[in-house]
Amino acid sequence: MFKKIDHIGLVVSDLEAAKDFFLVLGFTIVKRQLLEGEWLDKVVNLPDAKAEYIALTIPDTQTNLELLKFYTPEGNRDGHISMSNQIGFRHIALEVKDIESVVVDLKKQGITFFSEIQTFNNQKKLCYFLGPEGIILELAEYL
């Protein structure tokens, strides 16, 4: 039935800040485009929809991310701070090699982590950090 997850779409209020954040993580831009028209209104079930999107990928992988900024109708936010235990979509996990060096590099870029690197069942090292728009991300290294 399904072949794979094609991409993850994130709606953001600051498209440039979100793009810059994911570029720091090693994503590259595949495409940037303004979206509008009857086809979009129907797909997203919103009247007079106009949005801009940036398609990103991690080079040499099938990891695809779409950042979307809706200009009309403007999106809203529920105002809650992202917490790991909130119901619904919670985080994006990125597999890395040498998690320690990745954390050091990202800290140099100004990224703040929830905690130091933790080890789960001697199988995986991991840590969480906060991205743009309250998105929680995880770094994971399998042992």
PLM regions with names:
Residues M1-K19, T28-Q33, F89-L94, L143:
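N-terminal beta-strand motif that seeds the catalytic metal site of vicinal oxygen chelate
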Residues F2, N45-K50, M83-Q86:
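A generic structural micro-feature
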Residues D6-I8, E52, N85-R90, K125:
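Short amphipathic alpha-helical segments
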Residues V11-Q62, K108, C127:
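Core segments of cupin and vicinal oxygen chelate
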Residues R32-L34, E52-A55, T63-L65, A93-L143:
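Vicinal oxygen chelate
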Residues G37-K42, E74-H80:
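A short, acidic/glycine-rich surface segment
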